[in-house]
Design a protein with these regions (language model features):
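Conserved active-site-adjacent core of cysteine acyl-enzyme catalytic domains
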Residues: 60-196
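Active-site-adjacent structural segments surrounding the nucleophilic cysteine of cysteine proteases
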Residues: 1-78, 163-168
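Short, solvent-exposed mixed-charge patches
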Residues: 1, 196-197
Length: 197
């Protein structure tokens, strides 16, 4: 993995992963909604790039465009952020195929969840991950040589302890029927999403 800092306020980092180049957006550069609730649509932008999904003109989907698309095509808009389930919904809708796969997290299976996430990252996938306190969506890009997660968050790429990151996970209800696309409480918006490229 190659991480490059760029002189670009909108996309301050670029990450090279094998044949993929991911621009890491800074959510504060894409309008009022994105400044307040943009972490989830930022994660969607990275996920769509990873899956090779671009717009007709060849440009990446930015946060403002994803937000406008989601309001139009993803049910239940209430003025709040997309949940992790909503991220899965909008990514697959834009992609026109299933590239995003949601997994629940009720807080009772941290060891197996960490093992599943680690396996998925080592298989070359990325993970959209919902944190608590504050509620925040990040993207797990990989595992470094010291065993830490490589995390895209707030327009930066940082490294974090795997155990520490799993402890930050938002916990909620299991089952697809209990999930909401737009934020309406932690019970209906927890878990993580595996993105396959």
């Amino acid at each position: 993995m190659r991480i490059t800092i760029r002189k670009d306020k909108r996309y301050p980092y670029k990450v090279g992963m094998d044949d993929k180049k991911l621009l890491i957006p800074q959510q504060k550069q894409f309008g009022g909604f994105c400044q307040k609730h943009g972490c989830s649509v930022t994660a969607c932008s990275i996920a769509l790039q990873f899956a090779g999904v671009k717009q007709e003109d060849g440009t990446v989907w930015n946060q403002r465009e994803i937000y406008q698309y989601a309001k139009k095509h993803i049910p239940g808009y209430n003025g709040s952020k997309l949940t992790i389930w909503g991220c899965k919904s909008v990514i697959n809708k834009i992609a026109g195929r299933e590239v995003a796969f949601w997994h629940s997290n009720n807080g009772r299976h941290d060891t197996s969840i960490r093992a599943n996430i680690d396996t998925s990252l080592r298989e070359g996938n990325i993970i959209l991950f919902e944190e608590k306190n504050p509620i925040h969506t990040v993207v797990l890009l990989g595992i470094d040589s010291k065993g830490r997660y490589i995390v895209a968050t707030n327009g930066r790429v940082v490294r974090r302890s795997r155990a520490g990151e799993i402890r930050k996970a938002l916990h909620g209800m299991t089952g697809a029927k209990n999930q909401k696309n737009w934020w309406s409480g932690r019970d209906h918006g927890a878990g993580y999403v595996v993105i396959k490229g």
